[in-house]
Amino acid sequence: DWCMMLGLTLLFGMLAFARLGSTRAPQSGYRFEKGESGKQEVILYFDQSVTVRTLEVYLGVKEKRSFTLFVPNAAGDGWDQISEPVNVKSVFCWNSVPVNYRTYALAIISQDDIADVMEIVILDQDGKKVLPKNAERYPEAFDEQELFPEYRTYEYETMFDEVYHARTAYEITHGLSIYEITHPP
């Protein structure tokens, strides 16, 4: 009986934990900081005009960050706002920000005092990744492009109360103040 019970437990364990989730997520991040010179915005330039369909933003530990998007104006002497402030809501997962605009440059401006973005992936009208020609200016925001999944599934995000466990563990590990005190890491 013991052998049968152990065998079934092992079999169930292997089935239950197989493909539970991804073991890789963006590790480095760019910090937008209001009041810091050049840190409130990211200004991206492309080799040529490109239709930006979406920005895929992987947020750090703080949720509900707000960003406004700008493109160069027709005269080339300023910037035009192309969106109302966009709320990027979820931590530790990819958030889609619709853009649908053809441009050679794009400015992303944070509306918050601090916003940590672990990675930004820019997708064109065909869903292909577009790396800005000045990505090296913001290396923490563009250094882990390969982690963006070709197909979105549950494996690439935290769900239900996993959000609290993962977030609390991250905060403890990095010496940050803890957001949720009722869930252990």
Sequence positions of predicted segments:
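Exposed aromatic-hydrophobic patches
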Residues: I43-F46, S90-P98
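Soluble non-transmembrane domains of integral membrane proteins
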Residues: S49, V61, P85-N87
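Membrane-integral, polyisoprenol-dependent glycosyltransferases
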Residues: D1-E33, I43, S49-E56, E63-R65, ...
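Solvent-exposed serine/threonine-rich low-complexity stretches and specific carbohydrate-binding patches
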Residues: W79-V91
